[in-house]
Amino acid sequence: MSKVKKNDETLSEVLVDVNRVTKVVKGGRSFAFSAYVVVGDKAGRVGAGHGKAKEVNEARGKAKQAAKKRMMKVPLYQNRTIHHDVVGKSGAAKVILRRAKAGTGIIAGGSMRAIFDSLGVHDIVAKSIGSTNVYAMISATFDALNKLASPKSIAMRRDKKVNEISVKSAEIQVNE
């Protein structure tokens, strides 16, 4: 959605993937590390970043900085789930995110679970279709999160009142 200023103290960091890469040169092999990190404040802000370096800790630090630069705000319904179902794509990876009733929990696989934990979502159902590559999955999940909109923002875009959009939107406005 929109870029957000970041505050280090409140951010949680999750290391999603570390990969050792090898470059074959004339003198032998050169090793390096690649890291993917998700950061979030557990209150609707989340970001993901990728870092590469000769040491794991350096790669993790670079990834964290990149994730903080790419943080975005996501509208949440009652600070526990998303407002509506949404589909995100990235290459061959496709992700379906569905809102869930209170008490459902996070039903999602690996890298998606890390994003939802960092985001502060408590109830969601997520299904991945196609590629299960970590980078593609995270990218597809962020694509889906970018498509989310609150009923209030949809009403403003259409120059209408929230209760004119749909019956469910009227219920949401009353509950907020």
Curated annotation (Swiss-Prot):
GO aspect biological process, one term: translation
RNA-binding in keyword set: yes
PROSITE patterns with a match to the protein in the record: RIBOSOMAL_S5, S5_DSRBD
MF terms (GO), sorted A to Z: rRNA binding; structural constituent of ribosome
Keywords associated with the record: Ribonucleoprotein, Ribosomal protein, RNA-binding, rRNA-binding
Coiled coil stretches, renumbered: none
One cellular-component annotation, GO: small ribosomal subunit
Domain of life: Bacteria
Keyword Transmembrane carried by entry: no
All copies of domain S5 DRBM, residue ranges: 11-74
InterPro entries: Ribosomal_Su5_D2-typ_SF, Ribosomal_uS5, Ribosomal_uS5_bac-type, Ribosomal_uS5_C, Ribosomal_uS5_N, Ribosomal_uS5_N_CS, Ribsml_uS5_D2-typ_fold_subgr
Membership in a protein family: Belongs to the universal ribosomal protein uS5 family.
Entry's free-text remark on domains: The N-terminal domain interacts with the head of the 30S subunit; the C-terminal domain interacts with the body and contacts protein S4. The interaction surface between S4 and S5 is involved in control of translational fidelity.
Cited function: With S4 and S12 plays an important role in translational accuracy.
Subunit structure: Part of the 30S ribosomal subunit. Contacts proteins S4 and S8.
Protein name: Small ribosomal subunit protein uS5
Organism: Rickettsia conorii (strain ATCC VR-613 / Malish 7)
Gene name tied to this protein: rpsE
